[in-house]
A protein has these predicted regions:
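The AdoMet/dcAdoMet-binding core of the Class I SAM-like
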Residues: 47-153
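Rossmann-like AdoMet
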Residues: 1-66, 91-92
Length: 153
């Protein structure tokens, strides 16, 4: 099973799901048109942990040294990929996260292969902390009146 590749066509590119290792742990990888887009650990206890170093920079917005007496309750993420950061956010923070993803196929894949649905069920039982909007990110920002303390792209 872990040597298999899954190939999926979407309106926004050819998607490949494959398997590999990162620091001795099994991972599932999402590529779009040959470029790595996202990944997740397969072991249950690691599924909501960050795999990519740069994503820890996203989390600096929650560091008390950067907050300057403000609380981050609402975060907007443009582009969900395999929803790696939203899973981490739900598992490690108390606020709300909205994700704008133009490719609904990625959301469906994330639920099926990247543990998004399990994470939502575990950390957002009332279904009010995570929302996904399927549209162009710029259109969403231009149209939406909601104020976000943090926007991540």
């Amino acid at each position: 099973m872990y040597n298999d590749k899954i190939e999926i066509e979407s309106p926004y590119g050819h998607i490949t799901i494959s398997y590999g290792r990162h620091n001795k742990h099994r991972v599932r990888v999402l590529d779009i048109d040959g470029g790595m887009e996202s990944a997740t650990y397969i072991e249950e206890e690691l599924q909501n942990e960050l795999l990519f170093e740069y994503m820890y920079l996203f989390d600096l917005m929650f560091d008390e040294n950067y907050l300057e007496d403000r609380q981050i309750n609402d975060v907007l993420l443009i582009g969900g990929g395999a929803f790696h950061y939203p899973k981490y956010f739900l598992a490690h923070h108390q606020g709300n996260i909205d994700v704008v993803e133009i490719n609904k196929v990625l959301y469906d894949i994330s639920n099926k292969y990247f543990y998004l649905e399990e994470t939502i069920n575990k950390f957002d039982k009332n279904k009010n902390r995570f929302h996904c909007y399927f549209e162009n990110g710029r259109d969403y920002i231009n149209r939406n009146k909601k104020k976000y303390v943090a926007r991540v792209k």
